[in-house]
Amino acid sequence: MTSTEEKTTSGRVVRITGPVVDVEFPRGSVPELFNALHADITYKELSKTLTLEVAQHLGDNLVRTISMQPTDGLVRGVEVTDTGNSISVPVGDGVKGHVFNALGDCLDEPGYGKDFEHWSIHRKPPPFSELEPRTEMLETGLKVVDLLTPYVRGGKIALFGGAGVGKTVLIQEMINRIARNFGGTSVFAGVGERTREGNDLWVELEDANVLKDTALVFGQMDEPPGTRMRVALSALTMAEFFRDEQQQDVLLFIDNIFRFTQAGSEVSTLLGRMPSAVGYQPTLADEMGELQERITSTRGRSITSMQAVYVPADDYTDPAPATTFAHLDATTELSRTVFSKGIFPAVDPLASSSTILDPAVVGDEHYRVAQEVIRILQRYKDLQDIIAILGIDELAEEDKQLVQRARRLERFLSQNMMAAEQFTGQPGSTVPLKETIEAFDKLTKGEFDHLPEQAFFLIGGLDDLAKKAESLGAKL
């Protein structure tokens, strides 16, 4: 009886194309979509078990699968066993303080977590009746974020930017700021990014004493596309357990959501699907929706997600970042132009947005000051062409004054960050929201027009401004 059962759940490899493996099963024993299959192989005298995920039914008892590990050493005819379940990961308090891969294997302590409760990474989003909209602001202590693009507690927040403008540094900054003050559980998903950054993050979290409350799940750049496509779901599953079973508010950090889309594109091509716009997979919106719809707040508990989104060639019309926009509550756009001025974080205040920058949510005073800052910066941007052609002296007196004020505003939106302390030698500063609103209100009204521009550069609040101004021979 046992041998018969084994025959019904075992198949043979018939074709291998990179990470795509076709497997033939006996009639009537074809595994379901998303089932995990195991194949034992020996390569260079090392034995290992490959995990394959069923992606397509080809007919004639054939299934097309995606390998979660490199397929070196896999040959035709190797026996493949159907586990009968989809990929699952360990969940619960035991995952905190440890690093896992997309399959739920512990990387810092091999074998750890095998006896934990496991949840499938393929889960349905909460029913509509259980969802709870959130409008509470999540204070970060970063002036530019809190004033102009306030984050929603229990919302989806994204940091957009091209290569090298500071997305990962800002994600690390948010982990430092929010996780330290948050007191809850954090889950970090490293999706297709550099292994070095993952190691740096581990060390930083340990130094900040928040590692004990953080679970890390990594599928890095050197992993096959199947792993990079599934690692975000693995991390999200761990976060869902804390939300649904332990009734906790959870922070979910994803770096980088573009790599999730990119991995889906690679897999789609290998599966033989017709490419869509710019070569992306035709199922791009569906795949993004399946992930984002699960990141949500339910009654009394929430998942607050912060996602870094790489923008290919700084093109915001690219389908990958464009598809992400639709799911977000707040967007922080990092600009190469702002970065080139040495203003950090390099947030573009005119392109960033938030659904809760509304007087009914943040209050009339906050909204009024934010709109005045945006008005001045927008007018300054409109005047740039005239200044470039005719020079600043040709402007009306009112516009000259506005330009000087806008330049001070730009510099005051910069801030020394905790994640950059080792480079700048300056401790990171946290500015309470009330002080941020007061300082920018005074600045827009011209109360600081007599101070040199340099006094506003890379500082925190009003106390820092007073010290910097004094060091430059001026007084508030």
Swiss-Prot record:
Look up the EC number in the record and give it. 7.1.2.2
Q: Where in the sequence is the signal peptide annotated? A: none
> Which reaction does this enzyme catalyse, per its entry?
ATP + H2O + 4 H(+)(in) = ADP + phosphate + 5 H(+)(out)
User: Where mainly found?
Assistant: membrane
User: By its UniProt entry, which Gene3D superfamilies does this protein fall under?
Assistant: 2.40.10.170, Bovine Mitochondrial F1-atpase, Atp Synthase Beta Chain, Chain D, domain 3, P-loop containing nucleotide triphosphate hydrolases
Citing just one GO molecular function, the answer is: ATP hydrolysis activity
Q: Which residues bind ATP?
A: 161-168
The transmembrane segments are: none
Instruction: List the InterPro entries.
Output: AAA+_ATPase, ATP-synt_VA_C, ATP_synth_F1_bsu, ATPase_a/bsu_AS, ATPase_alpha/beta_chains, ATPase_F1/V1/A1_a/bsu_N, ATPase_F1/V1/A1_a/bsu_N_sf, ATPase_F1/V1/A1_a/bsu_nucl-bd
Its function, per the record, reads:
Produces ATP from ADP in the presence of a proton gradient across the membrane. The catalytic sites are hosted primarily by the beta subunits.
Assembly mode: F-type ATPases have 2 components, CF(1) - the catalytic core - and CF(0) - the membrane proton channel. CF(1) has five subunits: alpha(3), beta(3), gamma(1), delta(1), epsilon(1). CF(0) has three main subunits: a(1), b(2) and c(9-12). The alpha and beta chains form an alternating ring which encloses part of the gamma chain. CF(1) is attached to CF(0) by a central stalk formed by the gamma and epsilon chains, while a peripheral stalk is formed by the delta and b chains.
Record-linked HAMAP family: ATP_synth_beta_bact
User: What's the protein name?
Assistant: ATP synthase subunit beta
Which species is listed as the source?
Mycolicibacterium gilvum (strain PYR-GCK) (Mycobacterium gilvum (strain PYR-GCK))
